[in-house]
Amino acid sequence: QIQGIQAPHFRAISSIAFHHLLDETKVNGRVVRSVVDREYGRIDWNDPEINQDPDFLQKFVRQLGKQIHQAALAEGEQTNTKLRTFINNIVEGFATSPEGIDQLRKRSVMVQAAILSVEVPHDVAEAVRGAYRDICRENEDDMTPVAVRSSAAGEDSRKKAFAGLQDTYLNM
């Protein structure tokens, strides 16, 4: 133990929680596409300032998630589909058509914004909050910074411990 450096504390939230999010929440695909098309088209993706800002895409996607959520509330639930179905359609569309990097990025933005636009089911939110409370209690600190990451199959096993296939968010 190095003074001032905390040993890592790990908490796993089961992938079942993510599947619950995908299967129990719904999005309005038309609203997602409309908002993403409009806002994505306003960005000059070749602008050096945008390409040099490591936080731009994350902030952009979060903003889109909020806009989609508000627009979907105003629209109602008449044409909502399961989040999983929407994502599968977006991914399948990419897999079956030749697209460049810009279209791939746009599809990625669409999927991320759709996920961020839905309300997290209560049991999933409670599992995350409970894991965080446990870490804070162990550290005797009510605001412990944490890294949040998703792991793909095969990551972090005894034979293969690596990060990088999925996203990691530090100091959450």
Residue map of PLM features:
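N-terminal beta-alpha lobe that positions the nucleotide/phosphoryl donor
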Residues: 1-172
